[in-house]
Amino acid sequence: GFDFEYLAQEKGFLVVYLQGYKNFWNDCRGSADYEANLKDVDDIGYYKKVINLIEKDFGINKNNIISTGISNGGHMVYKLAYEIPNSTFLHAPLVANLPIKNNNDCDISEVEVNMAIFNGTNDQINPYNGGLVSLLGNDSRGEVLSSEESYKYWRDLSFFEEENFKILPERDKNLNSSVTKKDVIGSKIVALYTLVNGGHIYASPNVKYSSFFGGNVNDINTAEEIYKIFENLKIKN
């Protein structure tokens, strides 16, 4: 859908797409059978090197980095938040829940971060309510926490006074899908976007997935929602 590219032109930021080893990231799920995990690829080191290279070549402000990724990429975003929390200003994992404790092999810092999670209630790969992650019969990725538990983990690391909840405007005229947002705005912003009847997808009016992925949600533009949080953080800080 090129949402990030269009938004970058409008807002004046740089979009960078990192490529994982053989199309996978070495995330926190210790049991996963893809080679990035089996070979313990140093994706944290890779991320740091890319940031330094971009700073050198483009003069970016390293204090304004947003990191987002979908599915395995979302799990890599969690790893960044766990292991190098201060290297990213805003973390935005898509269709990914935290792994359960006994399958989490990340070095967990328990440092508060800005976090925005986008998960679909009809996701058959990353189950919204937690459980076994299964893709085409491959169960090696193990079990994950629920979306609510994943959100609460990051929420409870921050200091906040109240939690907000709202139903976002209906924009695609499809009453079978909708989006709710729960968040806290305290020492950090932590948010959970629930894509009601959405599947293993990136939510946007500009993107359409096949039925295999569990259902489209067109009421929000995910890139725009992430950038709104970024703008609110810059005002807040």
Language-model-derived ranges and their functions:
Residues 117-119:
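Short beta-strand/loop motif that positions the catalytic acidic residue
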Residues 1-4, 98-107, 175-181:
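Alpha-helical scaffolding within the catalytic cores
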Residues 19-22, 97, 198:
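Short beta-to-alpha linker loops that shape the active-site pocket of alpha/beta-hydrolase fold enzymes
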